[in-house]
Amino acid sequence: MAKYDNKKQLRCSFCGKSQDQVKRLIAGPGVYICDECIELCSEIIADEFEETPQINVGSLPKPSEIKDYLDQYVVGQEDAKKSLSVAVYNHYKRINSNLSNNDDIELQKSNILLLGPTGCGKTFLAQTLAKFLNVPFAIADATTLTEAGYVGEDVENILLKLIQNADYDVERAEKGIIYIDEIDKIARKSENPSITRDVSGEGVQQALLKILEGTVASVPPQGGRKHPHQEFIQINTTNILFICGGAFDGVDKIIENRTRVSTIGFGASIQSKQQKDIGAILKKIMPGDLLKFGLIPEFIGRLPIIVTLNSLDQGALVKVLSEPKNALVKQYEKLLQMDNVELEFKDGALKAIASEAISRSTGARGLRAIVEDIMKDIMFDIPSREDVKKVIVTENTINTKQPELVLEEGAKAIEAPKKKEKSKTKKDIESA
């Protein structure tokens, strides 16, 4: 409401200054605002919407520089790292070209499909890439997605995660990277069209088509279905790089059936699963194999770059444990270093851990669980012992959970408590 003093003089509705105290007083329906308050409001709005530094795609590192950075964190997978480095470099070159060039030639987007067994580094590769490029990055799980109108997440929620990670800066989010994990789980359940609606398989593939290709999508800022009257955020997905990853368990059999020369009888060679090199088989993959697996042709067409990853052998897993900048062994060394204790893993111990991960078929992802199990008792006892200088984990420690301890000079060795022998029963004496 308009404010008046005793002499009926007009006053600013915001700061309360009278008409005589300001240069200008602007009237609205029942309210007044002075020039000083207008200037203050203008400054507040300018600070609120101050432009954030944009991604300088012009100064993007070269493919060799991208690969060198990936080498510091990711062990092996040389072909995959090369392919990803080139694909990402070309993607941001394309953005730069389309923004600055008025040429008739418009460069089209090339999304990426990563294939490889579980625990081979698909997700980690995408995370490391986004960290190096300093662009907004989001990871989505394809298993939670359903068609619009059914229980589950809409495909637009993937874009919402990217916008949130860009602090709701839509322009910055439009140059980000989205990694969709478990993409093989939305494959069609059968090769033939079904009479029942496949809302979490083919239906999701159909819903993802326009987003992958490039469209202006309407994203609900509060997550969609529970708030139907909210205002939508408009985001253009044309310059968003989509990387889809999946294990595609069983596609190797489809490839083998296509490439193998069929032999039957005594001359037929039979290979066990352990003898097969899954990585070598996946390198022969063709779009037709993905079609048989359950991806629809339109979806395959929007993922033109197919990158295959090899399963990690014992040697590679040993390197994963010790070589990268954030290697698992280095993490535990740092944890014990905080207790002023040195930690050392012998080569035999690292090989035994790698062998256990292979037997569990968990790849690099399962290494932490194995090491955590070995280190549990060590990390429980060491903080309360001031006489221990160094802990050595050997191959024998993997089974016994008892490491070799190097004590401070002058400290007395403390033996581990021995298990009490069970008293012999009458039956044991008679059998003896």
From Swiss-Prot:
One of its GO terms (biological process) is proteolysis involved in protein catabolic process. Gene3D superfamilies: 1.10.8.60, ClpX chaperone, C4-type zinc finger domain (6.20.220.10), P-loop containing nucleotide triphosphate hydrolases (3.40.50.300). GO terms for molecular function: ATP binding; ATP hydrolysis activity; ATP-dependent protein folding chaperone; protein dimerization activity; unfolded protein binding; zinc ion binding. Residues 1-53 form the ClpX-type ZB domain. InterPro entries: AAA+_ATPase, ATP-dep_Clp_protease_ClpX, ATPase_AAA_core, Clp_ATPase_C, Clp_protease_ATP-bd_su_ClpX, ClpX_bact, P-loop_NTPase, Znf_CppX_C4. Pfam families: AAA_2 (PF07724), ClpB_D2-small (PF10431), zf-C4_ClpX (PF06689). ATP binds at residues 117-124. Keywords: ATP-binding, Chaperone, Metal-binding, Nucleotide-binding, Zinc. The keyword Zinc applies. Zn(2+) binds at residues 12, 15, 34, 37. One of its GO terms (cellular component) is HslUV protease complex. Residues 411-432 are annotated as: Disordered. Belongs to the ClpX chaperone family. PANTHER family: ATP-DEPENDENT CLP PROTEASE ATP-BINDING SUBUNIT CLPX-LIKE, MITOCHONDRIAL, ATP-DEPENDENT CLP PROTEASE ATP-BINDING SUBUNIT CLPX-LIKE, MITOCHONDRIAL-RELATED. ATP-dependent specificity component of the Clp protease. It directs the protease to specific substrates. Can perform chaperone functions in the absence of ClpP. NCBIfam families: clpX, PRK05342.1. Component of the ClpX-ClpP complex. Forms a hexameric ring that, in the presence of ATP, binds to fourteen ClpP subunits assembled into a disk-like structure with a central cavity, resembling the structure of eukaryotic proteasomes. This is ATP-dependent Clp protease ATP-binding subunit ClpX. It comes from Clostridium acetobutylicum (strain ATCC 824 / DSM 792 / JCM 1419 / IAM 19013 / LMG 5710 / NBRC 13948 / NRRL B-527 / VKM B-1787 / 2291 / W). The lineage of its organism: Bacteria, Bacillati, Bacillota, Clostridia, Eubacteriales. The gene is clpX.
